[in-house]
Amino acid sequence: MESFDIAIIGAGPIGLACGIEAKKAGLSHVIIDKGCLVNSIYNYPHNMTFFSTSDRLEIGNVPFISHNPKPTRPEALEYYRRVTSSWELNVRLYEKVNTVDIHSAKKTISTSKGSYEVDNIIIATGFYDLPFLLNVPGEDLPKVKHYYEEPHPYFGMKVAVVGAANSAVDVALETYRKGAKAVTMVVREPEISKKVKYWVKPDMDNRIKEGTVKAHFNSSITQINEHDITLATPEGEITIENDFVLAMTGYQPDFSFLKSCGIEIGNDEFKTPHYDEQTQETNVEGIFLAGVICGGLKTNKWFIENSRVHAEVIIDEIKGRS
């Protein structure tokens, strides 16, 4: 069994930042991820552009040079590959953490490929793995997608986009412009979210106003069939022809994993995990949280740019105890 000072669960940007700080402090580390490097970014839409400028995504004092005002997904993937190689981080990919044993002097992590004995654990798993489900009949049909990659498969198709935030708006506009036969938005709220990117929202509003993108507000899907969907709308129940449902309904952290590690989850509306905001340590001694997972269901609280500091805070705390 391999032994390390720190195990970092999650090889996203914040997990990598934690690994960098561990190396700088002379602490041995292993970064474990069930997917590929920066798996969430890899699963973003292929044509996605970040909100942040490239300098706000930098970690480890490695410059992030973008050829655009704001970096793209391919640029981010290239950047974090370069960071990982430059710092020679100890990354174990496609390795799922099965259990974490906290009931001994050293913590034991059992994975799909082996076991590790560690003094400290940093959980930086993000929130992109578990989509919020529609919980309606037919959601298990292949035509229903909770992740969107690119518009090409939807050319000539009748598409329903569920949601009203940035992802839903981007998907609706891109599929419309790349030749979808019909694009219909299904929105529970009375309007498109005011939090949609300021340079995109007017475009979406105008497409709805002119009718090139149809929108049903205060509405929800109640049934999904192979060739149509049923909606509950203020005017009553309607059925429309449909080839694909793109459910951009958001994602949530894996609370079951946190609980299996002994971490307490709050009773607040966001199910915020219990941790000390001064040290990032949870109620379990030696287990820390970093990145977006700290916000629980409030997934818009922490981003790469404002949670990079978690890495330094955690490693300083661990180093101060040794």
Predicted regions and their residues:
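Rossmann-like dinucleotide/flavin-binding elements
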Residues: 1-3, 8-34, 147-191, 278-322
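Beta1-alpha1 glycine-rich phosphate/pyrophosphate-binding loop at the start
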Residues: 11-89, 169-199, 267
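A Rossmann-like FAD-binding core segment of flavoenzymes
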Residues: 88-110, 115-116, 178-270
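Extreme N-terminal leader/targeting segments of oxidoreductases
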Residues: 1-6, 129-130, 136-144
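Flavin (primarily FAD) binding-site architecture
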Residues: 123-139, 252-263
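AMP-binding/adenylate-forming core of the ANL superfamily
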Residues: 121, 243-246, 287-288
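Short amphipathic alpha-helical segments
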Residues: 19-21, 42-43, 133-137, 172-174, ...
